[in-house]
Amino acid sequence: MVLERVNGPADLRTLSPDELAVLATEIRDFIVQAVAVTGGHLGSNLGAVELTLALHRVFESPRDIILWDTGHQAYVHKIVTGRRDAFPTLRQAGGLSGYPNRAESEHDWVENSHASTVLSYAHGLATAVEEAGAARRVVAVIGDGSMTGGMAFEGLNNLGHSGRRVVILLNDNGRSYAPTASRLSQSLARLRSRPGWVNLQGRLEQLMLEMPGVGELAWSGLRGAKAAIREVFEPPVFFEDLGVRYTGPFDGHDIGRVEEALRHAAAYDGPIVVHVLTQKGRGYPPAEDDDEKCLHDAPVFDIGTGPPKWAPAGYTEAFARAMVEIGERHPQVHAITAAMPGPTGLLAFQERFPDRFHDVGIAEQHAVTAAAGMAMGGLRPVVAVYSTFFTRAFDQANLDVGLHELPVVFALDRAGITGDDGPSHHGVLDLALCLQIPGMTIFAPSSAQELGVMMREALERDGPAAVRYPKGMARQVGPEEVGRGLEAKCLRHAAPSGGAGDIAILAVGPLVQ
């Protein structure tokens, strides 16, 4: 096997094109087999095999700094940087992290798994590299929906303004968890649909740049003409309007083509985007056939049949059911998600009430302030978000919702410890943050039935409310154990014989179990 000969990035540079093609197939098989045993992110990594191999053949990590946005597409990076043998412990206690991890390897620089941050990291690191006069490049890999986040645009704007030497590899698979929602993604989709025109343009650009002495000058002279042509033949490439050079799109599964583009980008004196088109879930039929999320993430599964069709479970399932029931009775209720309609349990609501469902992309801050605007206009918005991602929009929840005493409901899924999702996904801050928001009422259901009651009560309140519930299964209880959400209920009573007892144990939420 070629894979057994790859113990570090340098080994990739010794391989022939034919060996690289074999290696890509072997890596896909390895990832499917590993994730089938432990669970993990599948579709994103199957789509990032060739671009990762090209990256490590062109750039010399860790001398060159390779940054991964979100990080769930970095399994191939881990495999080729010496961690292949640790994959049986993927996402296990004390084992291999599901995201880049600084403690694991010198090849990992950032380890958060929240999206749209990498361009800001890249700007800062490129500033430090330039000041030190170091002969190293900074490469930022972003995509899989992350370009819908506002922070990515802030980083892009500052890169263009500063002129820092950063190579941005845009992995465009058209999706995050679900098909990406943004005008940018629509523009990129139109580019994807005209590969003939785009490939001709890309080859012409590279030929001009290779002309001795006059290549860069000729390119500069053609930019005005290209801009005019774009207005007619393709959507404006807004990257260049921000001062960031753009090249592509290229076939992200053609290692040689991606390598060639990256080598030219590495020589460019400024920020540059290399746009590659990839297929999420490539090479594994169950992932390719999964129209909803291309097996973005998967539990333990049988390789022959693939994971069972995903459906919300436990508290998330109870929330999904409650939202549809509430939506039937209250036409003013709207649901908002930040690129996670399936994981937050809103697919059924989306199907039943498409005009009252809003997927804003990876944009939690916008989601919360948009909900504030809806509430001002008389609607009753529900923002469904993981607890860990709610922290990204605390300022908006505090000022735009709380200060205005607006009736916005936050459905905070994955509250508490989330196990194999890792430290960046633990929902341990939402309770402390919600307590600081003016007028906030916090609900914590202890059963599936109580979640439904609390959602209805939260929507009846005149100010902000949060319903927080954990990952995993929910208790199923009878009506005798379901009270009103803001009333304590005595579930058990045990006093000494003949005595009243002077100790009361108060449990909230899942602690009731």
Predicted segments with their positions:
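N-terminal amphipathic, basic-rich helices that act as targeting or association modules
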Residues: M1-T81, F238-L262, A267-T278
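Short, acidic loop-beta-alpha module within alpha/beta folds
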Residues: S116-T127, L347-A348, Q365, T369-A372, ...
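Long, well-ordered, tryptophan-enriched scaffold segments
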Residues: N173-F319
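Short acidic, glycine/serine/threonine-rich loops at helix termini
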Residues: V76-G82, H123, M147-L156, A178-R183, ...
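Glycine-/acidic-rich phosphate or pyrophosphate-binding loops and their flanking alpha/beta elements
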Residues: E260-R263, K293, G314-R329, G345-E351, ...
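A short alpha/beta connector and helix-capping loop motif
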Residues: G149-N171, A181, S185-R194, R380, ...
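A glycine-rich helix N-cap at a beta->alpha junction
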Residues: R84-P100, H161-A178, G196-N199, H358, ...
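Cofactor-binding active-site loop characterized by glycine-rich and histidine/acidic residues
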Residues: H41-S162, Q332-V333, T337-A338, L346-L347
